Amino acid sequence: MKHVKRGNVISMCIVALLVNISISQYCLAVTTEEELKNWPLSCYTADELNKVREWEKTWVGKKINQDNIDQVKEFMTEQFYNMFKNPKDWGVDELWFTIVPYQQLPVTPGQVALTKKHAPTAKLDPNPRKCFWKEGIGPNEFLMGWEKGETAGFPFPFPKSGIEMAWNLESNTRGDTKSLDRVGVVVNPRTRVERRAVQPWLFDYFTGRCDAPPTPNKPKNPKGIRRAMYLFIEEPLDVQGTRYMELRYLDVKKSDDVWVWFPLFRRIRRMGFSYKADTIDGSDLAPDDEVGWNGHVNLKTWKIIGRKELLVSRHQDLDQLTKQTGQAVWNGYMMERTNSYVLEAKWKDKNAVYSRELLYMDPEDWKCLQKVAWDRQGRIWRQFFFNTMVVKSKQGIVQPHNYELYSSDLQRRHGGPSLDKIVEIGQTIHNRFWSIQNLQKLGY
């Protein structure tokens, strides 16, 4: 009997040792300095790019509409194809775009330097963590050093799992500090009615800053703010003067703070965390949908489905975009082939607004290119485009900028073509701006 017990103890020790070794190996840095020597890389290998260039000899400069879209259908999501194949459903007789040559997106000098500094030591925590959402954070989900603001750049430039890719998405600080004017319309193509929206926005990252001083973190941040966001509604007139401020924290035990100034009551109201899943001012866009996912990485599970070549707008000339009244999608997109990753996201909360999301990720700067979302019943619901142009910051740094966050409801069939017009990138915003007192002052 003693021998049996001793054997059981030895077996348990061996199993524990093997589990410990496997966890340790999983959490070792996945990126080596040797790999980073030639980074950043194109989304295509040399051989793949040669094939793309041959294809471009036939297609670059061609106008694509419902008559010839079937010939390039393989480079689209089903939802994008259906939209441009059936333009009358979206308020116009013809939807069209043109094909342009592929160009590699620039990665900023700060992103390159900080990625090469931090990626070789980036790893996921082998231990579970408690957080403000009941589903918790499992082993090998949380980026170590994140809660202290010790990370910057892309932690996993060569991701091997969905969670690593999601951390790359979260780590893109998009110019560090940015102000823009979002001007667009929500269109019902059946009635051709448009509801105009004008919203100045501010974004300010407190940690992981790459190019705009101070880097990598803003000083005097006792609350541990990760990112701050502010918007003011100028139009439509019925909600003019509404102001929204959102603070996300590094500490996963601390829920996001969302404050809204309502001019009608001249009062500030603190909104619940679930408010971020509600759409903004009658559009199809919720705060959570910004940039593909605007929330804590570990609220969802992430899985790489594979690769998908897409035609996407990454080097757009805004003067080429046109639309008629009642048209729910822009004409004139300049589309180039891009070899994206397909990243599946599912909320851990089974009662969340989406049952499933597919994010098409750009492997050159780890931004979301397009997103498709399913409702709680598993039906296709919403489609998003995160279209890009190349701009310069206040510091003269060339970088990608999402000039449009397009959202559409595929069930009720309406959409929101818009433009995010840059005011400034890389400006200085004092920490005092991000306070309830200042939000109230701005309201008065």
Task: Give the positions of each predicted feature.
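Flexible, processing/modification-adjacent segments and terminal tails
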Residues: 147-181, 185, 193-196, 250-255, ...
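C-terminal soluble interaction/assembly domains
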Residues: 346-422
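Sec/Tat signal peptide C-region and signal peptidase I cleavage site
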Residues: 23-29
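Bacterial N-terminal signal peptides
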Residues: 11-22
